[in-house]
């Protein structure tokens, strides 16, 4: 009869929901940087949510666990490891990885000192290679430091360079001189400054743009089909200032970690 059929459908629906939730792979991706932590929740390859935290500890993570049925996770940090946090994640996730030099990767790492290689740098390289496999790639990450990572078409990470980031340069000029003020980035930057403040802004910002474009042009002499990714907290600031064609992806490191 109809009631029996309706009850049967409800039972089947409940079973399917339970089955789907049980085998649903919801990943917790944590990228802990020098000044903040980016956290994302992925359902397979789809990002369901993302957060940025200045303070990041067990209390913050536990609040995320209350909202999402997390089953897997990876934790990458460029600062000292928080043992309490790592233990909490390992105890509450079915499959947890703390990213270090012992973890197997989908790219070949030719860096001579893999233990000292920043995990954010490595994750960005993995993310770029995942999005554009079989291509020569340059990844520029504009944050506290600016990093340049080179991956060839065979999927080998060849190495990279590190230079001071925009905010770091502003602070250094103020810290290591007696009279130069501490300034911040502005939307409009002249080619040549007309006072001390704009001279610093123009020098720092235009200097970084020339640096980025210079690396791209030099590397394209050897890798003519080089593709360039730009990521990092300040990527939006340089995206439209570069004369070279790029792929801007603010979540590139998270994409790499989710691999």
PLM feature spans:
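N-terminal glycine/serine-rich phosphate-binding loop of ATP-dependent small-molecule kinases
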Residues: 7-20, 24-105
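Gly/Thr-rich phosphate-binding beta-strand-loop-beta motif of the actin/hexokinase/Hsp70
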Residues: 25-44, 128, 134-157, 173
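Glycine-rich phosphate-binding loop of actin/hexokinase-like ATP-binding domains
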Residues: 49-51, 137-170, 228, 247-252
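Adenine-nucleotide phosphate-binding core of ATP-dependent small-molecule kinases
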Residues: 51, 188-227, 234, 245-246
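Conserved phosphate-binding catalytic cores of ATP/NTP-utilizing and phosphoryl-transfer enzymes
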Residues: 106-137, 254-259
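Glycine-rich phosphate-binding loop plus the immediately following alpha-helix
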Residues: 119, 124-133, 158-201
């Amino acid at each position: 009869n109809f009631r029996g059929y309706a009850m049967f459908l409800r039972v089947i629906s409940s079973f399917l929901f339970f089955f789907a939730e049980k085998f649903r792979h919801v990943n917790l991706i944590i990228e802990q940087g020098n000044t903040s932590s980016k956290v994302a929740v992925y359902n397979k390859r789809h990002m369901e949510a993302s957060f940025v935290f200045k303070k990041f500890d067990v209390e913050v993570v536990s609040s995320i666990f209350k909202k999402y049925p997390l089953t897997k996770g990876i934790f990458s940090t460029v600062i000292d490891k928080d043992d309490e946090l790592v233990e909490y994640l390992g105890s509450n996730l079915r499959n947890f990885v703390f990213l270090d030099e012992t973890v197997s990767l989908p790219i070949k790492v030719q860096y001579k000192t893999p233990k000292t290689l920043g995990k954010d740098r490595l994750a960005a390289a993995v993310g770029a290679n995942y999005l554009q496999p079989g291509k020569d790639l340059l990844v520029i990450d504009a944050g506290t430091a600016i990093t340049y990572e080179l991956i060839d078409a065979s999927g080998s990470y060849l190495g990279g360079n590190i230079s001071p980031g925009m905010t770091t340069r502003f602070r250094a000029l103020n810290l290591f001189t007696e009279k130069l003020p501490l300034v911040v980035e502005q939307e409009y930057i002249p080619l040549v400054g007309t006072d001390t403040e704009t001279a610093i802004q123009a020098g720092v910002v235009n200097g970084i743009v020339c640096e980025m474009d210079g690396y791209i042009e030099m590397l394209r002499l050897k890798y003519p089909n080089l593709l360039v990714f730009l990521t990092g907290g300040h990527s939006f600031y340089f995206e439209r200032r570069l004369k070279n064609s790029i792929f801007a992806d603010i979540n590139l490191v998270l994409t790499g970690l989710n691999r």
